[in-house]
C-alpha cells in the first residue's frame, strides 16, 4: 500500500482520523470537515473504542456468568488473574473506602490495554480493508477513506479518559473533605499562613490540573510515537519485516505498561483526593 503514495502522503493518510461533521448541506465526511474544528467527530476512534469496550464487557460477563468453584478453565483462570492483579494494586495503593475504585481500575486497565493492543495490527491491513469497502459500497476513492484503528493515538480520547478521572478527583475531594475542606486544601497548602493564599492557590491549581493533563499526554504521546514508528518502518519496503518483528516484540512490554501506568496513576490520584492532609 505504501507504494501508492509518496512517503509523506502515506504517513499522513495513516495518521488521519475518519471524520464526520454537520455542514449546511447535511452530514459530511473527512476532507469536507477540514474547517469543522471542535464540532468534527472522529468516527473511527468512537467505533473502535466503543467496540473494544463492549468486547471487554462481553468477555468478562460471560466468564463471570459461567464461573465455577471447581477447576477453572483457561479463560476463567486468565480473567481471575487479571482481576486479582488489579485488586491487589488497589488494596495496596488506595487508602480510602469506596467500592467504585476496584471496578474502575479494572475497566481502565483492560479497556486501555485492548485499545493499545490495536497497535500490533499490521499498519496497512485496516486502512486497506476500509478502502476496499469504501470503494465497493460507496464508490469512494480508497485514498480518501481513513480508519485509524488505535484509539489511544487520538488526543480526543486520551483527554476524555483523563477528564473522567479529573471529575472523580474533584468529586472525592469534595465528598471526603467538604467544599470548605477542599477550598482550604487549595488555599492553605503548602504554606499555612493566610498571606500566602494567592501563591498557594496558584500552586495547588497547577498541581491539580497537571494530573489529568499528564495522564492524557503520556498515553497519547507514547502510543502516537509507537504508531508513527510502525508506519515509518512500513515505508522501507521488503526490509521492514525484521524491524516490524523487533518493534512488535518490544511493544508486547510497552503496551501493557502504558495501561498499567494509567491505571496506577488514577488510583494514586483518587487516593490523594480521599486523604485529609
Swiss-Prot record:
Quaternary structure note: F-type ATPases have 2 components, CF(1) - the catalytic core - and CF(0) - the membrane proton channel. CF(1) has five subunits: alpha(3), beta(3), gamma(1), delta(1), epsilon(1). CF(0) has three main subunits: a(1), b(2) and c(9-12). The alpha and beta chains form an alternating ring which encloses part of the gamma chain. CF(1) is attached to CF(0) by a central stalk formed by the gamma and epsilon chains, while a peripheral stalk is formed by the delta and b chains.
Annotated protein name in UniProt: ATP synthase subunit a
Membrane-related topology note: Multi-pass membrane protein
Main location: membrane
InterPro entries in the record: ATP_syn_F0_a_bact/chloroplast, ATP_synth_F0_asu, ATP_synth_F0_asu_AS, F0_ATP_A_sf
HAMAP family attached to this UniProt entry: ATP_synth_a_bact (MF_01393)
Organism, as annotated: Alteromonas mediterranea (strain DSM 17117 / CIP 110805 / LMG 28347 / Deep ecotype)
An example molecular function term from Gene Ontology annotations: proton-transporting ATP synthase activity, rotational mechanism
A GO biological-process term: proton motive force-driven plasma membrane ATP synthesis
Protein localization: Cell inner membrane
Sorted UniProt keywords: ATP synthesis, Cell inner membrane, Cell membrane, CF(0), Hydrogen ion transport, Ion transport, Membrane, Transmembrane, Transmembrane helix, Transport
A cellular component annotation (GO) from this entry: plasma membrane
CDD domains cross-referenced by the UniProt entry: ATP-synt_Fo_a_6
Function field: Key component of the proton channel; it plays a direct role in the translocation of protons across the membrane.
Domain of life: Bacteria
Listed transmembrane segments: 40-60, 98-118, 154-174, 219-239, 245-265
Pfam families for the chain: ATP-synt_A (PF00119)
Family: Belongs to the ATPase A chain family.
